[in-house]
């Protein structure tokens, strides 16, 4: 067995990176469809070159892959820059079989935007996301761990914040009302 590898720069490695992200996740992190798939989509859409991920430039790549067909038409979700999404509470608690069902394209694209939001846009730092991830890894239920992301906000308030932050970045998400 060899000890070297070569990456063909002419090929898109996003699916491989997506699947490797799943392999590196704890089984507990996989209980939340949106988080599991969002994190994998986030990594798969982040530029990778020379053995490094470029997180500083990934927002434009993620937006392009979610709203269009990706930079250089390398593949994307093509949701457009204005789309309706499920109610946030329902989405964050969606069973995996439903997540990957008839609206899978929307669910995966939204998951990438949600991951980016919690990694870069939420609050003044990453405490909410870190606390959520620690809770999940320690065996806390998804519903309980979500309280750490909500941090006193209702799902409707969080949905509005996500909509506002993404609108400033050129993507208009419209979460359905949960009632």
Tell me the role of every PLM-derived stretch.
Residues 1-32, 36, 49, 142-145:
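Juxtacatalytic substrate-recognition/specificity segment
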Residues 30-179:
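Acidic/His/Gly-enriched intrinsically disordered linker/tail segments
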């Amino acid at each position: 067995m060899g000890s070297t590898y070569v990456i063909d720069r002419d090929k898109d490695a996003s699916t491989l990176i997506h699947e490797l992200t799943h392999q590196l996740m704890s089984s507990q992190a996989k209980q939340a469809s949106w988080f599991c798939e969002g994190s994998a989509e986030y990594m798969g859409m982040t530029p990778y070159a020379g053995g490094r991920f470029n997180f500083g430039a990934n927002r434009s790549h993620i937006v392009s892959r979610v709203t269009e067909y990706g930079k250089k038409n390398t593949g994307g979700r093509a949701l457009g820059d204005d789309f309706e999404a499920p109610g946030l509470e329902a989405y964050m608690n969606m069973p995996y079989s439903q997540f990957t069902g008839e609206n899978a394209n929307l669910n995966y694209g939204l998951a990438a935007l949600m991951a980016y939001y919690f990694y870069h846009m939420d609050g003044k730092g990453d405490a909410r996301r870190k606390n959520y991830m620690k809770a999940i890894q320690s065996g806390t239920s998804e519903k309980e761990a979500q309280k750490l992301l909500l941090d006193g906000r209702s799902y409707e308030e969080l949905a509005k914040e996500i909509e506002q932050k993404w609108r400033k970045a050129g993507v208009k998400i419209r979460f359905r009302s949960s009632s």
